């Protein structure tokens, strides 16, 4: 297929794009370019959270949202008057079941699933009508109202425990721990299996291939042929660095006949600093990294958050073993006096810290509860693949996680606080503070001279000395947002999640399902250091399975466990459980090295398959769960923008530093754009969110890949795209002397291949047409079409 992916369609006119949104119909040869790569009009569709969800089959994602965001609100603010436990049921309304919400009370159904504006519950919490406003004493925080609106919009999913199929839940006696550990795959020990014997041994170049091929053969499927070398090198560059290869790199690879030619490419990419930037961004998604400004009750800017981002990039580039990578983010400030390790606690410190709305006890408790819920949720889903925050109000409805487990972990974070503090050497801080004190002392002396004539005579030399002191002040020392210990107390279980209602004590410790029936208690400070030890203990199978699954996901577009942050009962089972465990055990044997894991995967025949579509294979495995081909993937917004800057020759490859609010005007990688918690505070937010960047209000395990009209309008009409097209056109004019050579160069830069004859002829015909503006404007339009092509936006 050509770069435009649209050879069978004919259009009878075109739209020439201008730099700032103007359009004019010009007709002619550019008609085949106007829809720009991929037949935009045919691809336009929308993707939503899924208002189609039904009560009978809520997804794991929706249930997590309900348990983390909705049940705590209903429990704390509604159940005292509207549940089975209410002394007197008010308004005939029960809110402790979906059926109760749908039935409603005296005024009708409380919710209309999928329609928040038509739902009485939403109208009440919006506080627009004082006669129906709820809760009666004061409105809910805006963030909680937004959560309720989102929940109704997605169809009001509500988990029904009697339908869970949980094999070991006994309501009256707690959990059958042994049964869970023996029957649920995620809680079993990692077992290293021998790679299975397969028939087509010629395809196998790696143990990974044996596991994959065995599943394919059992289903009557065969693997796709190998990808062409040009496709392979472009895939490797995009997978490992988020940038395309240069034509020179492609030529060198094609000319290298040695059997390890591709291994050399992989090793070079893993050694490049761009590797850490690209994979650091993947990690920042799960770490819900932002530069602050989350809105109501979470409105603080985090001016030094970028230091955590840079720490992640640096740690990945130097291949810090993953167990140490995890330990540093949980307790880096406690592991050594190295302030660099302390920066790693930004994993928690740059998350939301809610403040009290008004300072009353209820608001203070709510803010504290929401902050702790974020810490526990982000920690457990990121490192363990478990939704521990679902046990905030009660024992987990599906997984072997008790409310005591939740508050044991919450107590650890309740004994830790966020500080913006120095990471500079003590002598640097002392010198700066001494200089500032000297300035203040001189300012006081000047002020003390008053109007006395004799004293006034001393003012001039004092002012001169003050100016000298100001010029001599050393640069402000570096600071970072850190998590530090502040106490050593256990928390009680909060009755129904309300911190004002303490229940039984919950000593700080690790999860019972992992640590055993009598887990050791954490008594060392907050307990974070002991928590870090427990999480990275090789006996804990969750941590290692979760990370190898995440790495696999980013290389194939789908994970072996398709719910990467939920390995519990509602999560999906692995498609290749033996392969998952083989990867996990090999990963640990290789010293928890992420770079070795990447290399392992990329050198397999499985990863090197083409993305060739075959109808017979699709009929048997339409979702490609068994991996009969490589999944073609749309580039994430960072890779797409960065790739444009790379091929136009504009990319600034400098590493690290403070973020830019105006990322569309910058030549730096998109990683260095400012990101707000709600995705609506900085200029860079709108662009990023348009192309599926997740709002970092909570951990994000996988991005959506939408195709919506506004994206195509941006490609056609934005000043950013026009500027990139002009830059590419200018580069081609500089580097080549005639149009045919320029067209060839453009295809090599963008797609890592030369154009086929039809593509060259099409380009030459358009460029030669004198009725469509100047030569320069035709080249700009042609370049914009190539940059917007399906082939450029996709990783094959």
Segment roles from a protein language model:
Residues 1-30:
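N-terminal secretory signal peptides that target proteins for export/translocation
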Residues 122-126, 207-216, 287, 315-317, ...:
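An acidic, gly/pro-interrupted, aromatic-rich
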Residues 513, 518, 758-771:
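Helix-loop-helix junctions that connect adjacent transmembrane helices in secondary transporters/permeases
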Residues 65-79, 144-151, 375-391, 409, ...:
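Sequence/structural segment immediately N-terminal to covalent heme-attachment motifs in c-type
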Residues 106-112, 697-703, 767:
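Conserved phosphate-binding loops in nucleotide/dinucleotide-binding enzymes
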Residues 32-47:
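Bacterial N-terminal signal peptides
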Residues 47-333, 396, 416-546, 550-561, ...:
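Aromatic- and Gly/Pro-enriched helix-to-coil junctions and flexible linker segments
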């Amino acid at each position: 297929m050509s770069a435009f992916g649209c050879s069978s369609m004919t259009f009878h006119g075109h739209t020439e794009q201008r730099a700032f949104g103007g359009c004019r119909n010009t007709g002619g040869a550019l008609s085949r370019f106007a829809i720009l790569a991929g037949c935009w009009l045919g691809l336009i569709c929308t993707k939503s959270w899924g208002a189609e969800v039904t009560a009978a089959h809520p997804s794991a994602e929706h249930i997590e949202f309900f348990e983390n965001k909705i049940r705590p609100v209903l429990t704390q603010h509604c159940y005292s008057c509207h549940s089975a436990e209410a002394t007197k049921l008010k308004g005939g309304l029960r809110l402790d079941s979906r059926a109760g919400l749908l039935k409603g009370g005296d005024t009708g159904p409380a919710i209309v699933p999928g329609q928040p504006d038509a739902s009485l519950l939403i109208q009440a919490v919006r506080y627009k009508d004082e006669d129906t406003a709820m809760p009666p004493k004061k409105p809910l925080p805006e963030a909680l109202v937004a959560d309720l609106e989102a929940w109704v919009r997605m169809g009001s999913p509500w988990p029904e425990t009697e339908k869970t199929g949980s094999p070991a839940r006994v309501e009256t006696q707690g959990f059958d721990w042994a049964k869970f550990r023996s029957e649920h795959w995620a809680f079993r020990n990692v077992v290293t299996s021998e790679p299975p014997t397969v028939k087509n041994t010629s395809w196998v170049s790696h143990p990974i291939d044996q596991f994959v091929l065995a599943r394919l053969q059992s289903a009557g499927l065969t693997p796709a042929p190998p990808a062409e070398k040009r496709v392979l090198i472009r895939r490797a560059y995009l997978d490992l660095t988020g940038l395309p290869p240069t034509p020179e790199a492609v030529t060198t690879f094609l000319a290298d006949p040695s059997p390890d030619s591709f291994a050399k490419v992989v090793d070079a990419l893993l050694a490049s600093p761009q590797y850490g930037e690209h994979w650091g961004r993947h990690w920042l998604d799960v770490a819900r990294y932002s530069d602050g400004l989350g809105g109501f009750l979470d409105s603080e800017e985090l001016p030094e958050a970028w230091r955590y981002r840079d720490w992640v990039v640096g740690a990945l580039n130097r291949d810090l073993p993953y167990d140490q990578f995890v330990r540093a983010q949980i307790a880096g400030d406690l592991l050594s006096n190295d302030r660099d390790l302390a920066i790693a606690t930004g994993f928690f410190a740059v998350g939301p810290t809610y403040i009290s709305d008004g300072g009353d006890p209820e608001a203070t408790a709510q803010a504290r509860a929401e902050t702790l819920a974020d810490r526990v949720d982000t920690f457990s889903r990121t490192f363990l693949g478990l939704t521990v925050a679902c046990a905030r109000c009660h024992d987990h409805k599906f997984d072997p996680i008790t409310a005591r487990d939740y508050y044991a972990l919450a107590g650890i974070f309740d004994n830790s606080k966020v500080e913006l503090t120095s990471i500079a050497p003590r002598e640097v801080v002392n010198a700066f503070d001494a200089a500032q004190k000297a300035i203040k002392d001189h300012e006081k002396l000047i002020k003390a001279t008053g109007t006395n004539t004799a004293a006034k005579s001393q003012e001039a030399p004092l002012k001169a000395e003050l100016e000298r002191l100001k010029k001599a002040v050393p640069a402000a020392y570096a600071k970072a947002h850190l998590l530090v210990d502040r106490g050593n107390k256990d928390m009680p279980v909060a009755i129904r999640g309300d911190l004002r209602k303490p229940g039984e004590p919950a000593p700080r410790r690790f999860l019972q399902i992992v640590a055993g029936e009598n887990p050791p208690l954490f008594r060392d400070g907050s307990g974070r250091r002991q928590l870090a030890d427990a999480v990275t203990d090789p006996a804990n199978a969750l941590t290692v399975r979760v990370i190898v699954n995440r790495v696999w996901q980013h290389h194939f577009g789908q994970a072996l466990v398709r719910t990467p942050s939920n390995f519990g009962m509602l999560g999906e089972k692995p498609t290749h459980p033996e392969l998952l465990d083989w990867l996990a055990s090999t990963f640990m044997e290789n010293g928890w090295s992420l770079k070795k894991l990447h290399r392992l995967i990329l050198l397999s025949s499985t990863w090197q398959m083409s993305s060739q579509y075959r109808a017979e294979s699709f009929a048997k495995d339409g979702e490609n769960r068994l991996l009969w081909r490589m999944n073609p993937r749309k580039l994430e917004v960072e890779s797409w923008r960065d790739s444009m800057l790379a091929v136009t020759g504009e990319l600034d490859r400098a590493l690290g530093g403070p973020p830019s609010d105006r990322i569309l005007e910058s030549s730096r990688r998109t990683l260095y754009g400012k990101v707000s918690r709600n995705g609506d505070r900085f200029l860079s937010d709108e662009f990023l969110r348009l192309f599926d960047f997740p709002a970092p209000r909570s951990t994000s395990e996988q991005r959506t890949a939408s195709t919506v009209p506004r994206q195509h309008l941006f490609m056609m009409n934005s000043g950013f795209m026009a500027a990139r097209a002009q830059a590419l056109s200018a580069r081609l004019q500089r580097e080549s002397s005639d149009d045919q050579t320029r067209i060839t160069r453009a295809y090599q830069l963008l797609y890592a291949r030369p154009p086929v004859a039809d593509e060259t002829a099409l380009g030459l015909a358009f460029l030669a047409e004198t009725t469509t503006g100047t030569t320069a404007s035709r080249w700009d339009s042609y370049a914009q079409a190539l940059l917007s092509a399906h082939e450029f936006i996709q990783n094959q």
